[in-house]
C-alpha cells in the first residue's frame, strides 16, 4: 500500500524541531497496531543529536515498513512508513538518515522479529545537555521504560558530542550517560552503538576510546550508514547476549546497610524473608526516618526484635547532630547503645551541615572513643563537601581511631581518582557499595572498577541499601549489586572479602 503526502497530517518545520517523530494523530481508517510481545519485539532507543534522523519535509509517497513501528510522544506505537532514506510515523514528521536502513538491515537478519524505534533525538544540543536531571535524559528514560513494557530493549543508537566545559570531556560525559541509562533501565549490559563525529577528530578519538573502555559498546565510522550500525549492533548482541540468566553469588553474604521498621512489632520478619531469597547470612539495620525509635516503648520493641534475630540481624545506633552538646554526653549514650547490641553508628546524615561541622565532630570523636564504626551519607544537602573531599580527609586525619564507612555521593568521585587516593592514604576509611547510583558509577568503566576493587579489596563492603520499601519486590527487581559484582571478573578470594569477610572483621562478627 502507498500513502500520499496529503493523507498525513503535516506539521510546521518549527514543530518538527521540538517533537519526536510519530505524533499520536493517526489515519482515520487505521487501527491501533497489534504488536508481538516480549522477545519477538526488539526495541532500540535513538538518542543524541539528529545525525541518525534529520527532520525533513514528508515525501509525496510512502510505503509501510513491515514489522517496524515508531513510539509517539504520547507513548503509542505507530506503523513506520518509508520512502527511500526517509522514515515517518503515520502522523507526520519525516526524518532522513541512517535509521531506515538500520531498521531494514535488522529486520532482514531475523524474519521472526519486529522492530520498535524510540526516537528521542535533540537537535542542536551537546553532550552536556544529556545529564541525568535534564529534560532530554528524563524524556528518553521515560520512553525507554514505556517501550520496555511492550518489548525487549536491545540497544541504544547515539550520535552527538560537543562538551564545552574544560573540566569534563566528551568521554567523561558519555561514560556517565550510558552507565546511567543502563542502571535506570536495569540492563547493565545494554548494547550501545555510537556514530563517530565526521567534523571533529577529537570527538571521534574519544568515541573510539569509549568503545575500548566500556563493555558492550561499539563505534561506527562516518559513512558506514545504517548497515554499519546494524553490523555493530549484531556483533554486540553476539558478544553480550541478553538471554543468559543473571549470575548468582555463591558465597553467603553480609549486608551492612539496610533499613527496616525494627521499632514496630514484627518489623524484622520481612527482613528475614528477604535475606533467605537473596542468600544473605547476616545484615545490619540503620534507623532512619520513621524507623528510628521515638520513645522508650518503640525502643523496647526494637531491642526485642533484634534479640529475636541476634546473630542474624544486627543494628546501628544513631544520634543526630545537635542532640548532644559535648563529646562526653555522646559517649555516655553510645556506650549504652553498644552494651544493648549496637555494632555501629549510622546512617549519619548531617542535614544542612558541612562534613566537618563542629556538631559532626562531636559524634566522630565519641564514636572513636566508644569503638563504633561510622557509616555516613553525603549528598547535596547532607554532610556536604567540595570537589576533592578535603573535609572528609580532615576528619579521617583528626580521628585515626574512628573507622568511617563511605556511602552515597562519595562514590561519585570515583572517576576522577579521589576515592582511590583517599582509600590509599587513610587506613581508617572503608566504603560500602549500596545504592542505585553506586551501581551506575561502578558499571561506568568495568576495567577501572575491577582495578580499583582489587587494589582496595580489604576495605570494600558489599551492601544494598534495601529497605521496607523494597523487601517484597520480586527477585527480578532486586538491587542490582547482586548482578553487577558477579560480572566484574573478580577472583573468588576478592569477592569473598567484599561479600562478607571485610564486614565480619570490621564489625567484630568473627
Model-derived features with residue positions:
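Bacterial N-terminal signal peptides that target proteins for export
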Residues: 1-14
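Cell-envelope and extracellular/periplasmic
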Residues: 29-239
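Mid-to-C-terminal alpha-helical segments outside catalytic/metal-binding sites
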Residues: 240-247, 252-254, 267-282, 286-289, ...
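Histidine/acidic-residue-rich catalytic or RNA/ligand-binding cores of hydrolases
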Residues: 202-205, 230, 264-268, 385-393, ...
